[in-house]
Amino acid sequence: MTAHLIDGKLIAKQVRQHVTSYVDSLTQAGKRQPGLAVVLVGSDAASQVYVSNKRKACDEVGFVSRSFDLPSDTTEETLLNLVDQLNEDKEIDGILVQLPLPAGLNAEKVLERIHPHKDVDGFHPYNIGRLAQRIPALRPCTPKGIMTMIESTKRPVKGLDAVIVGASNIVGRPMSLELLLAGCTVTTCHKFTQDLKSHVQRADLLVVAVGKPNFIPGDWVKPGAIVIDVGINRVNDGSLVGDVDFDKAKERAGWITPVPGGVGPMTVASLIENTLEAYVKYHS
């Protein structure tokens, strides 16, 4: 058996096309376009690539994209003042502060300063709390994108054993809330988990987000499982690989995401969806 590939690039393209059509209808009706403010502090190379992709996606769907590139020695007060200004700006529907922030800046404080209705990354405690209470508003982008990918398989997930490897605030923890909401029986594995192999082997749905190349051996994967690989790691030969041993896993899984071209494009697509949702729900 060879797994079906879940093509994140294709699904993300479909999402962008849907958003573009909606924005076109707004323009034709004489209404303003949704606006996204993207704030980058410092010159981290990876962050610059991520921000560039997000700005490009905004332009593609017809959003107004405002860029704020600040030096690495920016003070916390300056950054918080900028967030306050963007919170008050009626042309801006979403605010994205690219992480990680340089040393000396409190990311938690900055993210909590963003108004929950403009928190298109979905990281604000208000939005995480809404998800936990089963009344989601703006949802964290990567888990939201993963749910869209899972839905594309057409496999019903209610009652499935779902195992998440990794318990970060960005992916693992909100992913567990998403899968609970979808009706899965959810296990979250972390650095203190004992006998990781036994958990992975029983997973009908496996999400791995640890940032370690080929961390999960492919022969651990349950036959027919849905495998979502969030990791993207550059190895010694310069190639990009995920957190799961793809070559072996694809021979056992029913569906699997490639790396690259899997989860990454869907994270950006979900950001675009969230910005449109913020516009429609809160600011139009």
Curated annotation (Swiss-Prot):
Keywords: Amino-acid biosynthesis, Histidine biosynthesis, Hydrolase, Methionine biosynthesis, Multifunctional enzyme, NADP, One-carbon metabolism, Oxidoreductase, Purine biosynthesis. Belongs to the tetrahydrofolate dehydrogenase/cyclohydrolase family. This is Bifunctional protein FolD. One of its GO terms (molecular function) is methenyltetrahydrofolate cyclohydrolase activity. One of its GO terms (biological process) is L-histidine biosynthetic process. Pathway: One-carbon metabolism; tetrahydrofolate interconversion. The gene is folD. PANTHER family: C-1-TETRAHYDROFOLATE SYNTHASE, CYTOPLASMIC, C-1-TETRAHYDROFOLATE SYNTHASE, CYTOPLASMIC-RELATED. PROSITE patterns: THF_DHG_CYH_2. Pfam families: THF_DHG_CYH, THF_DHG_CYH_C. It comes from Alteromonas mediterranea (strain DSM 17117 / CIP 110805 / LMG 28347 / Deep ecotype). Transmembrane segments: none annotated. Homodimer. Catalyzes the oxidation of 5,10-methylenetetrahydrofolate to 5,10-methenyltetrahydrofolate and then the hydrolysis of 5,10-methenyltetrahydrofolate to 10-formyltetrahydrofolate. SUPFAM superfamilies: Aminoacid dehydrogenase-like, N-terminal domain, NAD(P)-binding Rossmann-fold domains. Gene3D superfamilies: Leucine Dehydrogenase, chain A, domain 1, NAD(P)-binding Rossmann-like Domain. Its EC number is 1.5.1.5, 3.5.4.9.
